[in-house]
Amino acid sequence: MNERKLDVYLGERLVGTLAETVDHRVAFAYADAWLEDGFAISPFSLPIEQKVFVPGSQAFQGLWGVFADSLPDAWGRLLVDRMLKQRGLPPEEVTPLERLAIVGSSGMGALTYRPAWDLHEPSHLGDLDALSAQCQALLLQEDASDLDALFQLGGSSGGARPKVMTEEWVIKFPASREMPEVGRMEKEYMDCAASCGIEVPETRLLPSRLCSGYFAARRFDREQAASQVI
């Protein structure tokens, strides 16, 4: 892959275009139709104006922060880098723009990127205990036998703790040094917050044979009504 330009979408609507500059920063310009009645996806950095926005520094890997937020954090980046190496691609040579193409439509948040770069075959959620064991093996620098499944389900996720994502849910697994009760504890914290009147997403504790259960939170970044959740 040698991607130098990506289109940014919100649902099926074109927001604008990203393009790599000669000094490896990533510029952005709003689409004409978006300028007519759209909103600023980053009000302070990217106001609604007909211009090319170029980051002033290499902060956020040369991306504007709103797009850098689409990139996976520690766990997701580990999965992406393993998949790249498995395909003979040095991770350090993959640009931030190409990493956004890998995210495609599978990342957290409402923004998606086209054309997407598919690294994997479709996978299904399957047995959560087996997936958790695969995550632990990867964290311990061991070989994960089903890296494709882990990448498909978690390669675009944020945060440091191992997790997988479905269309509607984010499911967290215990990290290698965490207590097996961490899922139940997080569920109880969220229930407590809800009892205090704090608005929280729907949560569940999914059953496990190995621990007290896996914490799951319903995603709000894919709801049609949440048109401005970036």
Language model features: what each stretch is:
Residues M1-I230:
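Phosphate/dinucleotide-binding and metal-coordinating scaffold of catalytic cores
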